[in-house]
């Protein structure tokens, strides 16, 4: 916004990530001290809040321990649909990728089927570990999860969506 800084009229200013209303947890690439440099795709003149992806709405619910079915985005959506007498449309899950059978690579024994009635595994090859997309990092940070890398972040993202804990492991270490 237009203003005066030390008596000089200015159309904008340089700010740290904290001065822009965020923090280094959401933007780990931001310098610890100093000016935050926006990504190349930032639109000149656009609100910093919008450019940083902070214009999203975050709703916090206080879920009691007897409602574990609501410990996920899908669970909250199902409950909201029931509360407001609306239709619930669960996400459509499709299986893509290779047709390899995980049992050909690893053996899993469920020791207590009452506690774990179903166990699923998939083989994913040719993964390059690196940073997650910015949109995913921001969504994880908005629910209090620190982004780590694409592999860890995708399991955390799915956990938040479905309430199911996932684990990614190197096949040779299982």
Feature roles, as predicted:
Residues 1-171:
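RNA/tRNA-interacting regions in translation and RNA-turnover enzymes
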């Amino acid at each position: 916004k237009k203003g005066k800084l030390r008596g000089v009229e200015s159309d904008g200013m340089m700010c740290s990530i904290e001065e822009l209303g965020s923090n280094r947890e959401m933007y780990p690439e931001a310098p610890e001290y100093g000016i935050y440099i926006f990504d190349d795709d930032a639109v000149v003149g656009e609100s910093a809040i919008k450019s940083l992806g902070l214009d999203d709405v975050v709703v916090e619910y206080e879920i009691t321990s007897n409602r574990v079915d609501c410990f996920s985005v899908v669970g909250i959506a199902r409950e909201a649909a029931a509360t407001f007498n609306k239709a619930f449309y669960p996400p459509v899950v499709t299986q893509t990728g290779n047709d390899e059978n995980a049992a050909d690579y690893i053996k899993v024994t469920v020791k207590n089927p009452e506690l774990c009635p179903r166990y699923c595994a998939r083989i994913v090859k040719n993964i390059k570990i690196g940073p997650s997309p910015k949109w995913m990092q921001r969504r994880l940070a908005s629910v209090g999860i620190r982004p780590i890398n694409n592999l860890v972040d995708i399991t955390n993202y799915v956990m938040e969506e479905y309430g199911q804990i996932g684990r990614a492991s190197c096949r040779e270490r299982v």
